[in-house]
A protein has these predicted regions:
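Extracellular "spike/adhesin" assembly and maturation modules
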Residues: 125-129
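Short, structured beta-strand segments at or near domain termini in extracellular proteins/domains
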Residues: 130-139
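Compositionally biased, intrinsically disordered low-complexity segments
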Residues: 10, 21-22, 103
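Extracellular attachment/recognition segments
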Residues: 27-122
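Collagen/collagen-like triple-helix recognition
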Residues: 1-17
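N-terminal segment immediately downstream of the Sec signal-peptide cleavage site
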Residues: 17-29
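Conserved beta-strand and immediately adjacent loop positions that scaffold enzyme active sites
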Residues: 3, 62, 134
Length: 139
């Protein structure tokens, strides 16, 4: 290997923007219900002006759910998949998976919560817990 070459010109650098979406599902930011006959889910849509056409086209957008474990806040990248257990009215076990994910477009982000049990009528009565999220845009 030869000697190191001269220092090059300074690069353009990286920009980033972090948007925290706190207490999604609370009274001030409630979940909406999709009410589709074949694929119901809960969602919350937010205006995110920093998510410009440039960020959408040439940048990167990552979503995280903020969780508390052992008294500390941690970030888990989306989608976040959680296997759950419940009982029906007769006491029989019900196993299902809850998936929390996000979709986005220019100027907005939508958080979605979907259960795999396909019990659409029941899902409308079982509202997801309040959750907090972080959206990180790099461009």
């Amino acid at each position: 290997m030869g000697p190191q070459g001269p220092v090059g010109p300074q690069g353009e650098g990286v920009n980033w923007k972090i948007v925290d979406l706190n207490n999604v599902g609370s009274q001030s930011s409630p979940w909406d219900y999709s009410n589709y006959s074949d694929n119901n889910y809960y969602f919350a849509k937010f205006d995110v002006p920093a998510l410009t056409n440039f960020v959408f086209t040439d940048g990167n957008v990552n979503g995280y759910i903020l969780l508390t474990e052992n008294g500390q806040t941690i970030q888990h990248s989306l989608p976040y998949v959680l296997h759950k257990y419940d009982k029906d009215a007769s006491g029989n076990p019900i196993y299902y998976t809850e998936t929390v994910d996000f979709v986005y477009g220019v100027g907005w982000v939508q958080i979605e919560v979907r259960d795999s049990d396909f019990a659409y009528e029941a899902d409308e009565k079982i509202v997801p817990a309040t959750m907090s999220f972080r959206i990180v845009m790099t461009y």
